[in-house]
Each structure stands twice: as structure tokens, then as C-alpha cells.
Amino acid sequence: MINSIIKTIDLGDGRTITLETGKLAKQADGAIVLRMNNTMILATVCVAKDTNPCVDFLPLQVEYKEKFSAFGRFPGGFTKREGRASDYEILTCRLIDRTLRPLFPRDYHSEVFVNIILFSSDGEDIPDALAGLAASAALSVSTIPFNGPISEVRVARIDGKFKINPTFGELAKADMDIMVGATADNIMMVEGEMNEVSEEEMLEAIKAAHEAIKPQCKAQIELARIVGTTIKNTYSHEVNDEELRSDIKTKLYDKVYAVAKSGQCKNKRIEAFQTIIEEYKKQFKEKELSEEKIFLIKRYYYEIEKEVMRRCILDENIRIDGRKTTEIRPIWSEVNPITGPHGSAIFTRGETQALATVTLGTKLNEKIIDDVLINDKERFLLHYNFPPFATGEARAQRGIGRREIGHGNLAHRALKPIIPNNYPYVIRVVSDILESNGSSSMATVCAGTLSLMDAGVQIKRPVSGIAMGLIFEKEGSKYAILSDILGDEDHLGDMDFKVAGTKKGITATQMDIKIDGLSYEVLERALSQAKQGREYILDKMLETIPEPRTDLKPHTPKIEIIIIPKEFIGSVIGPGGKIIQRLQEETGTTITIEEIEKMGRIEIFGDNKKSIDAALTRIKGIVSVPEVGEIYEGKIRSIMPYGAFIEFLPGKEGLLHISEISWKHLESIEEAGLNEGDFIKIKLVDIDSKTGKFKLSHKILLPHSEKYTAIRREQHEKI
């Protein structure tokens, strides 16, 4: 017998969300079916029974999958089944993971698998925020230790008003699109893109999202109470040796403090820290250094590193590289360091370095997005690569990971608002991280801006980005906001807050908070300090190239755009694409055509102006209307016994009958001396009103003396 429990959440705008448990996937540790309108999501959570004692992190894995059948579609490809995760699915996984992960107990190390599947959709409601709610609800109805619940909502600003969880259609009209993940009390995660908005406007949006999240969290608590899972499983995943912990702190604290205050570069600091721990291990005999003991030494040593770094910042305002809290690392940049791409730039900030290149292409280079709910074409692409050598790792690079997709997406969202509207080229920016010690995604934003300017793309305004950090004293009220954080400050700190924008406002942001109880006052201060930092970085960038180049690079493909009446689109394409293919072959150009707003938009790409002009002339000929009485120079396309077919305008052919070639009577077409490919002047003498066929004449253009001679000759021959 099915004993399902349902909880309904009223969104306050006529929409409701239902959470149901006890009906589907009952063998999972927790399972929730979420429904809103025609959207149905199943979220399950399972935990491994055994735990590895030598693991000091949470092995959490979040998977989000959209079924093509959810929208009544067949998957593509030969197998006709879902394949690897799309970028959208990966980004959704990351949004959920980043909100859930900080809320598991720090000493909980069991493998946890969260699986979310979209089983039904009407194509209107956006499922990613609902997936976060479903995942949290599945954890809430399980006995897995979890300090939630959380929920996620999307907040969009449309015509000056905030809309929670807008539809795809509504989101297209928004100038602000932010995903927020939070508990009832605290913001945990923020990510979004904006059209150059102020810090105050962004904070208002976050507050609006948080208010919408609170009742969703309350509903999950009530659901857990009904199910009976408010009391979570007890666990003991860490074995501790307090005597060893005390010994390490007593002997190593001052040494670690000295290294932390020395302000060394990353590699030297790592070597110095490693030397300290290796020296400490020498006091033990080899047989005493079991795997478990080495593991504990590393863990306790890490605790000291974290405490020392935090105390240096909070007590002395000194960071591990010697900077003050608001200080930005040294910056240098260069444009056009490599000449092959259509634009390139290097941006270096401290020990983080990005090389960005720009390639300008045709409409044929558009990225086709064929996801379950999103069918679109992308004209601005940004790809982010993070090779192992960027951090000095000796390993092979095995494809693109989730992290690279996530970082690339953030940089893409930061730059997209400043790309010119209706820009004729498809743009691809590639960022290769050559060195990394904190905030390589924001270095990508800066390098990407410089490379676009070097390529001659007339961006609306240049963008810079910065990563902010936070050190918060739990026992007191002291905190420090850090500008331009290092990798260690990200790892050991309490917040990673990336902000990108122009002088006018913010274009993208991403925030992950690792602690509870962060006030809006602290967020406001962090945003204000971030603004100062990114404006400083932007000024440094503009010293290298103050504005976009006025001209494209010489080897950039040339482009010409022509708008034609809709009814001529078929004439330009021709039957089976015959006309447009011939145009491209004969002129050496690439031609694309599409219908936009009941007009035909033709883009002609070529390596030089001469080839583009040739194609343009031919197209203008195709779309021009032939007029009776006009004289044209046509090309002989084919010769028949009864005459020749002449193309007198591109795509327009007519018959030059044998009787219209010469005033002289021709017994056969061969007497005319015509050859395929020859050019001949003709006059359009008539257009058949029924068939639309063109009647051509060449003899009518011949001198009258030839006509008189031909007539006399014919009369003489009759005598």
C-alpha cells in the first residue's frame, strides 16, 4: 500500500509547488517528487554504508539529468538516447553542490550521492532552481546528517520589478538574472548576470530572493517532521589523537607563523610549509608512521595553517603574501602577443596569468544548442582551459572538467552584456590559464576584455573582475574582507565572492559562503570594496589599450550585409541551394541567409573586398526585377538546337531563340558561333504573363544596316 506524504508551497502569485515522498524510489535514503504546473522532478539521495577513515573531506556528488521525453522529444545521435551531461546540466549540478556542501557537518565523510531527474516539463518553467529545492527536500526526508534545509530560487528584474522563478519567456526580458541558494537564515550561494547594475540593486535582488526562500525551507522542515526524520543518524567518522594534536601545535605553531608572515611567493611558501612538517615527522621511527598517523599529522598541521593565516589577518592585518587586506597584487598586461588569432592579450595579476585569444567567424560558426528545453544558437562563445602546468602539477590533461565549464560560464556571463548588439561576426574567446594562484576566472574576464579590444570588437565598455574573500571570527565580531584573494585564502577562508563589471555597473557575480550568520552589512561592505578593486584593475588594463582598435586585423574575414525582400530569399538560394552554392564557388566567399522580421538578411564573408563585391553584385542582380526593354550582358549557360539559354541576371535565365540571334536566317545553332560560357548582350523583349518566362533578343541590338542587308539577301535568294 502506498503511503505518500504531500506538502504544498504557495508561491503567492497563483503558482504552487508540491513536494511528495513515500510513493517513488522508496529504496533510496530520501526521495522527493516535486511538481509545479507540468514540471515534475524526482530527487533522490543515497549514502554509502562504509566510510574511509583516511578521508578528511565530504565525498558529495550531485547529478542532474534532463530526459528528452520530459518535453516529448527524441534525443539526437545514432543511439537515440541521452548521452553525457550537457553544459546546462553540469552548471545546474554545480549550483546545487555549492549550496548543499557547506551544510554537511565538517567531520562527516561518507559518500553522498544526490540524483535529480527532470521527468516532465512544459518548456515554460525553468527547472534548475526547482532542482535545488527538490535535492534539499530529499535530504530533509532522509536521516543523513545535514544542517539544512535550503532552497534555491531565481530572481529576475523585469521592467523594474523582481520576479521569482520566471519562465523562459519572462527571463528573456530581464536585465538581471540571479540564482540564490540559502537557508531560512543565511545566504549560501549567489550566481548571476546583470546588465551593468549597481551594488545596491544587486543586494536588493538577493534580499528579495531570500524572502522567497524562507517559506520553502519552512515547508521542508514541516515535511521532515511529518515523515519523522528531524533526528538524523549519529556517526563517528574521525579518529583523533589529542596528544598528537597538542604536540604539533606546541612545536610547529611559531614556525608556521613565521613562514606565514614572511610574505614569500607561492612555491617558496609551499616548500617552507612542507619542510616544517617533514622535519616534524623525523622525530618518529619509520614503524611509528602508520598511514593513519601520517593522515592525522597532515590534518592537524592543516588546522594550524588555517588558524595562523586567519590570526595574521585578523590581528595584524597581514596576509600570507605580505599584502594589506585591500591591496591588489601587481598587474601587467599585453595585447597582440601572438599574431595568428584575430585578437590576443595576456593578463597577469600576481601569480595568476591568463592568455586570451579572439577568433571572429561567420554565421556558420554559431554554436547550436540542442538541449531538452533550450534550442538556440550562440554567437558569443567563451572557452576556459586550465592545464595542470598552471599550478606546477606533473600530470596529463584529461578533457574538460566541471570546474572549467563553470569558470568559463562565469566569464562568459561577465563579458556577454558588453558585446555590441547585432554584431555581424560570431565571436569565440579562448582563455588558457598559464599560471594560477587565485581567481583565474576573473583573470579570464580581464584578458578576454583586452583581447576583444585588440581584435577591434567595439565593446560597449571594458570589463574587469575581482575575487573577494572573508575571514570571520566565530567567537567574536571581528572580520576582514580581502581583495584579490590567493588560492590559499580561498581554501582557508570563509567566502569566495567574485564580481565583474564595468565602470557603470556589475555584469556578473558568483558567491560561495562557507559559514553561517553572514549579515547583509558584511555583504554590502564586500561589494563596496570589490568595486574599488575592480575599478583599480580596470584602470591598469586601460593603460595597455585605452579603447578598442578602430580597425580589424588584416587577416580577419571581411563581411558585407545586405537586406532583401523576403520573397527573394528563394531566388538567392535557388532550387536545392544551386544558386547560392554556385555564387560561393565562383566568388570564393561564404554566404549565409536567414529570415529576420519578415526580411531576408544576407551575410557575405570573404578574404578580400574584391570577392565580396563580386558576390554582392551578383546578389543585387538576383533581387533586382527584370524590366522589359532593358539591355543586359548575359552568360550563355547552355546551347540547344533551337537556341541558347542566357543568364542575364543572377538566377534569372531566358531563352534566346535561334531566330533572335541574327537578322540572317540560321540553318543551325552552330552557324551562330556561340559557346557555353560566352557573354552576349541581349535585350529583354517580353515576359510571358502566364509562365513568367523571359523572351530575349540579340539581333534587335545589331545595326540597322545588317538588318537591311539580311532582308535583301533573303529576297534575292527567293528570286
Curated annotation (Swiss-Prot):
Q: Which residues form the KH domain?
A: 557-619
Look up the domain of life of the source: Bacteria
Protein family according to the UniProt entry = Belongs to the polyribonucleotide nucleotidyltransferase family.
* Domain S1 motif, first and last residues per copy: 629-699
Which co-factor is required? Answer: Mg(2+)
| Molecular functions per Gene Ontology | 3'-5'-RNA exonuclease activity; magnesium ion binding; polyribonucleotide nucleotidyltransferase activity; RNA binding
Q: What is its EC number?
A: 2.7.7.8
Primary subcellular site in the record, as a coarse category: cytoplasm
| Role according to the record | Involved in mRNA degradation. Catalyzes the phosphorolysis of single-stranded polyribonucleotides processively in the 3'- to 5'-direction.
| Keyword Protein biosynthesis among record annotations | no
Q: What protein am I looking at?
A: Polyribonucleotide nucleotidyltransferase
For this UniProt record, the keywords arranged alphabetically read as follows: Cytoplasm, Magnesium, Metal-binding, Nucleotidyltransferase, RNA-binding, Transferase
Gene transcribed to yield this protein? pnp
Entry's localization field: Cytoplasm
Q: Which residues form the signal peptide?
A: none
Summarize where Mg(2+) binds, as residue positions: 490, 496
What reaction does this catalyse?
Answer: RNA(n+1) + phosphate = RNA(n) + a ribonucleoside 5'-diphosphate
**GO CC terms in record:** cytosol
Per the UniProt record, one Pfam family is RNase_PH_C
Query: Which is a GO BP term held by this UniProt record?
Result: mRNA catabolic process
Q: Which PROSITE patterns match?
A: KH_TYPE_1, S1
